[in-house]
Amino acid sequence: VLFRSADEYVEAINQKQAKAHNVIIRSFTMDDDIGTMSYATAQADIKSRPVDRNLVDLFAATDNDVRRRCNYDSKRIVNKIITTKFRSEELCLIIAEAHAHLNQETDALGYLNQLRSKRITQDYIAYTIDNLPEVFQQNIKTDATGIPLTKLMSAILCERRKELFVEGDRWFELKRNGRPEFWVAAKGKKFITEKYLYTFPIPKADIRLFPDLLIQNPGYIE
């Protein structure tokens, strides 16, 4: 079974350690003092600010999507626990995206709809090429190949964002899809993410050791 019911999804997604239902790999399997403290700190941190309005807008047309109440509450505070697992649902979305890149639209829609049918609990309508929503206005504008998003690719990436919220995917999603530039406000300040920030700088000590071999990554002052 590739996907479980909505109720089974809710049960599985709230298991911090258990390999429940469609979990393939777990990276957090046991508690220790440091791990528990780090996990608690991270969980508290994500509750310290409301969920991005852009994510909330993704659910605007699908009030019956079970992930909406799992992800955040009416005040946009995160409900979902931080998840460090690889689930079969992500594998399905990877397959859907691969088919989309190959222009195999029917296959891509098939995998996308398999997942959606298990998350939208009432009034579910399968996507077709004719009824796909318009390209969602978000930070990501191009796909992994640099091509502007099609309706199908936009739908797949939107589904990834809803399904993999606080599962450690978002930064990689941004990096592989055009490294978009955007800003966020925090603690009264404006923080801008520029393209070069998706790559870490090479430590200066390493450059000094191998000056003829290493060149600092673009955007960083040597």
Predicted regions and their residues:
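Glycine-rich nucleotide cofactor-binding entry segment
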Residues: 47-53
